Amino acid sequence: MPVDAWIREEIEIPEGVEVSVQDYNVKVKGPKGEVEKKLFWPGVKIFVEDGKVVIYKDFPRRKDVAIVRTFKAHINNMIKGVTEGFTYKLKVVYSHFPITVKVQGDEVIIENFLGEKAPRRAKILPGVTVKVKGQEIIVEGIDKEATGQTAANIEQATRITKWDRRVFQDGIYIVEKAGKPITF
């Protein structure tokens, strides 16, 4: 099997975005804010050159190639986050007991889920905003991981176990990620 001498992936830095790399910390600044992430793998070099972010590895093995391309995807997501942002839409679904959802500090409070007296809580990660409009919840942020995890926390807070999901369909469900509808 032929072996490549190196792998080099390049990412164009769009106008209005500033990328800096220092001690494996990649910092991306843009019109919506700033995202920082530590990207380390032995032998992988990340640097900025001629308006591009370059990810480089000498004599890569299969795992090294996968890591380089993963780092490229992470940096692309960081650039997209500071320019466009990420949005998740969730829908509140209930059949009998009306669910009340409100944001309080860094938590989403879900009341009267299946008639329960105690409210359920979902954590909102730093840098993420949650808005409740009727039966729709909108989660927005510039960090894809934090935004997605917050949406997942809200969905998981209403997960039903030990009951037939075909009958008991109450809950909060992600219906749209980054402008693309989710099909069930």
From Swiss-Prot:
SUPFAM superfamilies: Ribosomal protein L6. GO terms for molecular function: rRNA binding; structural constituent of ribosome. GO terms for biological process: cytoplasmic translation. GO terms for cellular component: cytosolic large ribosomal subunit. Signal peptide: none annotated. Gene3D superfamilies: Ribosomal protein L6, alpha-beta domain. Keywords: Ribonucleoprotein, Ribosomal protein, RNA-binding, rRNA-binding. Part of the 50S ribosomal subunit. PANTHER family: 60S RIBOSOMAL PROTEIN L9, 60S/50S RIBOSOMAL PROTEIN L6/L9. Belongs to the universal ribosomal protein uL6 family. This protein binds to the 23S rRNA, and is important in its secondary structure. It is located near the subunit interface in the base of the L7/L12 stalk, and near the tRNA binding site of the peptidyltransferase center. This is Large ribosomal subunit protein uL6.
